[in-house]
Amino acid sequence: MAAVALALATGAGCASRSEVEQLKKDVEALKASQAQMAKQLGGARPAQQARALPASIDLTDAPFKGSPTSTVALVEYSDYECPYCIRHFTQVMPEIQNSYIATNKIRYMFRDFPIDELHPQSIRAHVAAHCAIEQNKFWDMHNRLFTSPGTHTPEALTARAQEIGLNTAAFSACIATDKYSASIRQSTAFAISMGANGTPFFIVGKFDPKTHQLTPIKAIPGAYPFSQFQQIIDAALANK
């Protein structure tokens, strides 16, 4: 809901009535999703999930790019169908890429946070990303998924796989299984347990390349402008 609230706060002046009504519906759907996930986490209400960040986060299997030895990391919990996540990908991520990732100043990692109630096709898109990992093409698929929202049918995903040079038979067989759904939902549950109310959700922290453990420094709960990331990342780099 943080991203939705941010959009209402920053864009209400130019939004149509239908757009505002849709945002309200998104908020209600996300509340329902959070309540359902809270039950899976032990019956706590959504408000009770807002808590301090954990002392450590295990990121052993998280796809990453940037410096393999950097001790400062940016972790994104995101949804391939979320409009605010897509906006971040198209407008803010290129600046982060150029300023921090391509220059090997930080390690950037991606984690799953699909919200089924808002985006029914999203879980399938996240499964496709995991299937691409099997053929060492995660980032190629990741980029295709964010630039083709709303077209995450099995046929469309197979077309994306062909575009990036995957073995489409192996890929199609992979997305037809359910072997990654549990880990994707665990990632979503973990994000909510940290107080994430919506997507995207980011954490900047100190990373140990040997143990793959992240010590969180600061959470960024929403699709904020590059300047917000710059301020927090620069502070972390100055104190590494």
Descriptions of predicted regions:
Residues A12-C14:
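N-terminal Sec signal peptide cleavage junction
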